[in-house]
């Protein structure tokens, strides 16, 4: 597929079958997403995408919430199909009537087509109206027995563009315990047992990203042993986190102030993991002490 092409997925299907989970999954996969898109607006929106250098992977939810606008779906699909710069697929999410009724009862929401409040009547009418679209769909997923996690996994398997990096990202961050634990951390490691560069006058005002501080931290025997064990712990479990459907895993490494030891370790870990995974490196508190001094 040329870089000039737009990779479009139209997400549709029965109300209550999991389209919200689906569109969130596409967002995690790096798609530009819009929920509840009126069919008549789709061609114009795609024209705007063609005119930019922005993300050309697009997922749009088009369903019966559009009510009268949904009647234009066939002409919209014809317009898309006639455009050689657009590669598109339709993902149709379905579930049994009984399961859909159960989900509506659980959420206490009204069905968009149940004018008199009878959910089952709305479901039956919607199924009839969507039958032609379902027959056109390249991907039909029955979510009756799927958990949200399993649905995310199904979408990732079918629509991610290969590699670990398409659907799973690792956030490696450093922090200082004195400023509090990161609320979004999945794994937290404490390196306060290592010798502290803060007590070396020539290193005090630097951070773990400076070469002399980095070498000071990582050259200690304790650092070498701990880092080896850290890699041996983290690397084997990454595929399991990905398989479980997690899109972002945050690994946080902390020292006292978040300036020296944790920064060096986080940087080293991020570089090691980046050979096989999509990794983002950040250092929450590395400049916190300097900012405090400047304000005083």
Curated annotation (Swiss-Prot):
<dbReference type="Pfam" id="PF03668">
    <property type="entry name" value="RapZ-like_N"/>
</dbReference>
<comment type="similarity">
    <text>Belongs to the RapZ-like family.</text>
</comment>
<dbReference type="InterPro" id="IPR027417">
    <property type="entry name" value="P-loop_NTPase"/>
</dbReference>
<feature type="binding site">
    <location>
        <begin position="63"/>
        <end position="66"/>
    </location>
    <ligand>
        <name>GTP</name>
    </ligand>
</feature>
<dbReference type="Pfam" id="PF22740">
    <property type="entry name" value="PapZ_C"/>
</dbReference>
<dbReference type="GO" id="GO:0005524">
    <property type="term" value="F:ATP binding"/>
</dbReference>
<protein>
    <recommendedName>
        <fullName>Nucleotide-binding protein SPy_0652/M5005_Spy0539</fullName>
    </recommendedName>
</protein>
<comment type="function">
    <text>Displays ATPase and GTPase activities.</text>
</comment>
<feature type="binding site">
    <location>
        <begin position="13"/>
        <end position="20"/>
    </location>
    <ligand>
        <name>ATP</name>
    </ligand>
</feature>
<dbReference type="InterPro" id="IPR005337">
    <property type="entry name" value="RapZ-like"/>
</dbReference>
<dbReference type="GO" id="GO:0005525">
    <property type="term" value="F:GTP binding"/>
</dbReference>
<keyword id="KW-0342">GTP-binding</keyword>
<keyword id="KW-0547">Nucleotide-binding</keyword>
<dbReference type="InterPro" id="IPR053930">
    <property type="entry name" value="RapZ-like_N"/>
</dbReference>
<dbReference type="InterPro" id="IPR053931">
    <property type="entry name" value="RapZ_C"/>
</dbReference>
<keyword id="KW-0067">ATP-binding</keyword>
């Amino acid at each position: 597929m040329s870089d000039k092409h737009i990779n479009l997925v139209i997400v549709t299907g029965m109300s209550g079958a999991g389209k919200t989970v689906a569109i969130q999954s596409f967002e995690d996969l790096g798609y530009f997403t819009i929920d509840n898109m009126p069919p008549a607006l789709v061609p114009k929106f795609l024209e705007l995408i063609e005119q930019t250098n922005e993300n050309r992977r697009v997922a749009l939810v088009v369903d019966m919430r559009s009510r009268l606008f949904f009647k234009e779906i066939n002409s919209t699909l014809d317009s898309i199909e006639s455009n050689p710069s657009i590669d598109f697929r339709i993902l149709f999410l379905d579930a049994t009537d009984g399961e859909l009724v159960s989900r509506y009862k659980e959420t206490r929401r009204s069905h968009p087509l149940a004018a008199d409040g009878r959910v089952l009547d709305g479901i039956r009418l919607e199924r009839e109206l969507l039958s032609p679209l379902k027959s056109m769909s390249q991907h039909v997923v029955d979510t009756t027995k799927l958990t949200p996690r399993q649905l995310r996994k199904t979408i990732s398997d079918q629509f991610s563009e290969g590699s670990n990096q398409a659907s799973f990202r690792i956030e490696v961050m450093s922090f200082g315990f004195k400023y509090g634990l990161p609320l979004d951390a999945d794994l937290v490691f404490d390196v306060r047992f290592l010798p502290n560069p803060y007590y070396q006058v020539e290193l005090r005002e630097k951070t773990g990203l400076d070469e002399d501080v980095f070498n000071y931290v990582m050259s200690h025997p304790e650092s070498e042993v701990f880092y080896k064990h850290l890699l041996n712990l983290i690397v084997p479990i990454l595929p399991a986190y990905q398989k479980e459907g997690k899109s972002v895993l945050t690994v946080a490494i902390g020292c006292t102030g978040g300036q020296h030891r944790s920064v060096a370790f986080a940087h080293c870990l991020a570089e090691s993991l980046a050979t096989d995974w999509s990794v983002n490196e950040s250092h929450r508190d590395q400049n916190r002490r300097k900012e405090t001094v400047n304000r005083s």
